From Swiss-Prot:
Gene Ontology MF terms: adenosylhomocysteinase activity
Taxonomic source organism: Caenorhabditis elegans
Reactions this protein catalyses: S-adenosyl-L-homocysteine + H2O = L-homocysteine + adenosine
Similarity annotation: Belongs to the adenosylhomocysteinase family.
KW Hydrolase (keyword) present: yes
Subunit and partners: Homotetramer.
UniProt superkingdom: Eukaryota
Protein name: Adenosylhomocysteinase
An individual GO BP term: S-adenosylhomocysteine catabolic process
Reported function: Adenosylhomocysteine is a competitive inhibitor of S-adenosyl-L-methionine-dependent methyl transferase reactions; therefore adenosylhomocysteinase may play a key role in the control of methylations via regulation of the intracellular concentration of adenosylhomocysteine.
Cofactor: NAD(+)
Length: 437
């Protein structure tokens, strides 16, 4: 593979200059990652690491990649979604010599090919670290390249869906490398998942359709962190939001925020917009499509494309019109139309540019710290054994701290007496691990 593969494969390398300009802008909005370069760059803690990354190849990810290389790592990259690559970002990184295999609009076969190119490096040596988003790279290495598992020091996983995958693998005895669950760092799940989607969801819907959100009935399937951000965003735009949930605790939270909570079967006949956020499959199926009013918009912000039954639409619709890339209008047998965005994949990345740089700096700083933890602790008494871990609270607080100055935040300082009264160190950590923010 190492001898025959191309040095990179992107849509158009001539987009690199445009990509570089946007990367420079993003760096100004990503103080956590820039602080990682300043703090760790001189000591090169990732020297010797060969990181295979599978995560949306965006401008923000470009800043992450260049932070990893600044810390000494060799990196190869693919995207974790066929529509999420920003081609100018991929070109800019490829131009620096980092092997990137990603372009917007990959086929499923091309998608797997791209991931496979990141397994073995140009010198013939295989990966020894994994940075994943959703679990596709992790699953591929375990299933198809088990001979490399013994040499992998660890992996870090970005998203809820990927963490669920790791937990299942661990329970079955299938996970063979230690893993850090980046998603459940407070500075990831309570920021990226909540505040990130709050801005990127309406961006995706509006770029795709130019729809007026005010006054529309919007159904949000799922009220986890992503669902909470989605519902809050749509409500802020003036939509009348209905939530569907399986969990009584989340359902009660939604009700206490003033949302109507009911089943999708009851909500569908009046739903102008449906957003799935569950991480589960078969959320919007044929029976729901047939209940929708004319020209209802259906989209997803869960990681995979199994939440919306796109296959049913392609099989049962009498006509499919592609309005523009990632915007398809289906004519149903009942004469009504359904507008599907991003083919049921992530609408905020398929139809827009994903979360803003600042909130992604939170998430990606956690990724850098996770990679440093796994790589540098290997072979020491603090080595991460086989298992699924979260980053220590001290690092979670550090990530938050690195982003305060840019927002003009001034922290109150505990006195020694106050710290003693609370039973916490003056410099933190301030909350127990079980605290729910």
């Amino acid at each position: 593979m190492a001898q025959s593969k191309p040095a990179y494969k992107v849509a158009d390398i001539k987009l690199a200059d445009f990509g570089r300009k946007e990367i420079i802008l993003a760096e100004n909005e990503m103080p956590g990652l820039m602080a990682m370069r300043s703090k760790y760059g001189p000591s090169q803690p990732l020297k010797g690491a060969r990181i295979a990354g599978c995560l949306h190849m965006t401008i923000q990810t470009a800043v992450l990649i260049e932070t990893l290389t600044a810390l000494g790592a060799e990196v190869q990259w693919s995207s974790c979604n066929i529509f999420s690559t920003q081609d100018h970002a991929a070109a800019a990184i490829a131009q620096t010599g980092v092997p990137v295999y990603a372009w917007k609009g990959e086929t499923d076969e091309e998608y797997e090919w791209c991931i496979e190119q990141t397994i073995v490096f140009k010198d013939g040596q295989p990966l020894n670290m994994i940075l994943d988003d959703g679990g596709d790279l992790t699953n591929l290495v375990h299933a198809k390249y088990p001979q490399y598992l013994a040499g992998i020091r660890g992996l870090s996983e970005e998203t809820t869906t990927g963490v669920h995958n790791l937990a299942k693998m661990l329970a079955k005895g299938d996970l063979k490398v230690p893993a850090i669950n980046v998603n459940d760092s407070v500075t990831k799940s309570k920021f990226d998942n909540l505040y990130g989607i709050r801005e990127s969801l309406p961006d995706g819907i509006k770029r795709a359709t130019d729809v007026m959100l005010a006054g529309k009935v919007a159904v949000v399937a799922g009220y986890g962190d992503v669902g909470k951000g989605s519902a809050a965003s749509l409500k802020a735009f003036g939509s009348r939001v209905i939530v569907t949930e399986i969990d009584p605790i989340n359902a009660l939270q939604a009700a206490m925020e003033g949302y109507e909570v009911t089943t999708l079967e009851e909500a569908a006949p009046k739903a102008n917009i449906i957003v799935t956020t569950t991480g589960c499959k078969d959320i919007v199926t044929g029976k729901h499509f047939e209940l929708l009013p004319n020209d209802a918009i259906v989209c997803n912000v869960g990681h995979f494309d199994c939440e919306i039954d796109v296959k049913w639409l392609n099989t049962n619709a009498t006509k499919k019109d592609t309005i523009k890339p990632q915007v398809d209008r289906y004519t149903l047998k009942n004469g009504r139309h359904v507008i599907l965005l991003a083919e049921g994949r992530l609408v905020n990345l398929g139809c827009a540019t994903g979360h803003p740089s600042f909130v992604m700096s939170n998430s990606f700083t956690n990724q850098v710290l996770a990679q440093v933890e796994l790589w540098t602790k290997f072979g020491t008494p603090q080595e991460y054994k086989l298992g699924l871990y979260v980053l220590p609270k001290t690092l979670d607080e550090e990530v938050a701290y690195l982003h305060l100055a840019q927002l003009g935040v001034k922290l109150t300082k505990l006195s020694d007496e106050q710290a003693s009264y609370l039973g916490v160190p003056v410099a933190g950590p301030y909350k127990p691990d079980h605290y729910r923010y």
